[in-house]
Amino acid sequence: MEYQVKIEAFEGPLDLLLHLINRLEIDIYDIPVAKITEQYLLYVHTMRELELDVASEYLVMAATLLSIKSRMLLPKQEEELFDEEFLEEEEDPREELIEKLIEYRKYKSAAQNLKEREEERQKAFAKPPSDLSDYAKEIKLSEQKLSVTVYDMLGAFQKVLNRKKINRPSETRISRQEIPIEERMTQIVDCLKSSRKRMHFMELFPYEQKEHLVVTFLAILELMKNQLIIIEQEHNFSDIYITGSEAIHDA
């Protein structure tokens, strides 16, 4: 399968690390490196399993995390344990990474604040100097806000893979039949149009074959990017539901 999807929501490895820190409710000043490294590598592995274009900077960050983890696991010399001067001068291997994360979080928050201000400003119109109502056009502002991130979608897909792995029999017959992304997109759209109600994310993965699971997930991302479906999540880390947009039902 030679299909690749580029997702704009992937802003870089620091963005992924912040997502994991928030998800796991970790103190950014005291990061458990072993745990965060495991979760980070799982996400990168999932991206590569989906044949997404994983930028080299993600792999560099993975190597950095592994390096920090190994440095923290190295045993200290016995004489160093009682050397107060050594303890004062010893640097935390996580220090540089923590500083980068805090700096990135600050700029990310500022960028989000500016974006929200821009959206609010677009909803306001200055009073015209004269009556131009005859020439005014009605402008419909879009109120749709995507609250579900690609990282949330990846997390949901990981649950699908884990559940299918548990339910899969010990011996399976692998089918090499390739499924075009466009065909699976059409199937999902038809399913949403016929149901006329929201569907649970898991409902779109009825088959066990890995190829079919990957194609289905990529099809969902494409439909999401093209605003043909609406992704809903009541609160963080809850179940994800999918409904067809007006564009689907009006077609």
Curated annotation (Swiss-Prot):
The keyword Cell cycle applies. It is found in: Cytoplasm. It comes from the Bacteria. Pfam families: SMC_ScpA. InterPro entries: ScpA, ScpA-like_C. GO terms for biological process: cell division; chromosome segregation; DNA replication. Its main location: cytoplasm. Keywords: Cell cycle, Cell division, Chromosome partition, Cytoplasm. Component of a cohesin-like complex composed of ScpA, ScpB and the Smc homodimer, in which ScpA and ScpB bind to the head domain of Smc. The presence of the three proteins is required for the association of the complex with DNA. Participates in chromosomal partition during cell division. May act via the formation of a condensin-like complex containing Smc and ScpB that pull DNA away from mid-cell into both cell halves. HAMAP family: ScpA. Belongs to the ScpA family. NCBIfam families: PRK00104.1-3, PRK00104.1-4. This is Segregation and condensation protein A. It comes from Bacillus licheniformis (strain ATCC 14580 / DSM 13 / JCM 2505 / CCUG 7422 / NBRC 12200 / NCIMB 9375 / NCTC 10341 / NRRL NRS-1264 / Gibson 46). The gene is scpA.
